[in-house]
Structure formats: structure tokens, C-alpha cells
């Protein structure tokens, strides 16, 4: 199935808004909104940890993972992955999210405050996006190849 990012974005944002769930666009999708041009992998959206159960009835048939605690080499968080019209969407719990700082070799809190955002228009909808500085800051901590590409693109924009 061909990926329909716009349709998936409008679908999940509509559900979050209908349930009055605070949210924030982050990750590679946010980086693209700020000017990175790398290929989009998924749509990352931060939500409060207790919001998963609120939206569950509306999204349950699209869940491919979770909601559950997830930890890998970079992330430690509550995570649920959805697939809608070929587009992967990661819903990330923001209350306890941590990232692994590759410089200090320590787990540290990631940007958690969903009220500190930049409003951006995406597909005709105004949505809260992680501030560019916070996005760059966490990408400088986890330093995956995609993060380095985003950092280079975002820091070199005039």
C-alpha cells in the first residue's frame, strides 16, 4: 500500500483533538517542518502517558505495537505504534520519556513539556511542534545517523 502521510496525519490529529489530548509533533516529521529534507520514516507525536487509554477505542484496529514500555539504545518511554494508510505513527508517552546521551553515557529526561511548543500549519491544520532548539538539543544527545542529518540541515538553515 502506498503511504498517505497527509491522510494519516489528519486522522490521528483529529482523534487527539476530539479527545482533548495535549500533543506535540516531534522527531523526523518535526525536523522536516523546520527544513530538513531527509525521507520521512514515521510521524512521532508526544502525548501524556495517561492519554493512551483515552484514545485506544478509536485506534485499536491500527495498532502494530503497544501501548507498552519500550527501551532500546536511545529511548526509554511508553510507546504505541500505529499504521494508517501505509504511514507509521509513533505515539510516545511524554511524562517519563528518557533518552540516552551518547556523550555522557547517561539516561536523561527528554523534552517533556507539551505546553512549550511552536504552532505550525501542517496540511491546513495548526498543530503544536517541539521547539526547534529542543529538537536539535535531543538529536545532539542521541546522535543516530538520521539525527546527524537533521542537525546539519537545521543548523545550516539561514
Positions of the model-derived regions?
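Compositionally biased terminal segments of proteins
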Residues: 1-158
Amino acid at each position: 500500500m502506498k503511504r498517505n502521510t497527509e491522510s494519516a496525519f489528519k486522522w490521528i490529529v483529529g482523534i487527539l483533538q476530539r479527545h482533548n489530548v495535549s500533543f506535540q509533533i516531534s522527531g523526523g516529521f518535526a525536523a522536516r517542518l523546520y527544513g530538513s529534507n531527509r525521507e520521512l520514516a514515521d510521524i512521532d507525536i508526544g502525548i501524556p502517558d495517561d492519554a493512551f487509554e483515552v484514545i485506544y477505542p478509536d485506534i485499536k484496529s491500527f495498532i502494530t505495537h503497544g501501548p507498552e514500555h519500550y527501551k532500546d539504545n536511545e529511548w526509554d518511554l511508553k510507546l504505541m505504534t500505529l499504521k494508517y494508510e501505509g504511514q507509521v505513527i509513533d505515539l510516545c508517552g511524554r511524562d517519563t520519556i528518557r533518552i540516552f546521551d551518547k556523550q555522557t553515557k547517561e539516561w536523561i529526561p527528554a523534552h517533556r513539556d507539551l505546553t512549550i511548543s511552536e504552532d505550525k500549519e501542517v496540511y491546513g491544520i495548526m498543530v503544536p511542534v517541539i521547539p526547534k532548539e529542543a529538537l536539535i538539543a535531543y538529536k545532539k544527545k542521541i546522535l543516530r545517523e538520521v539525527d546527524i542529518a537533521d542537525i546539519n540541515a537545521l543548523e545550516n538553515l539561514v
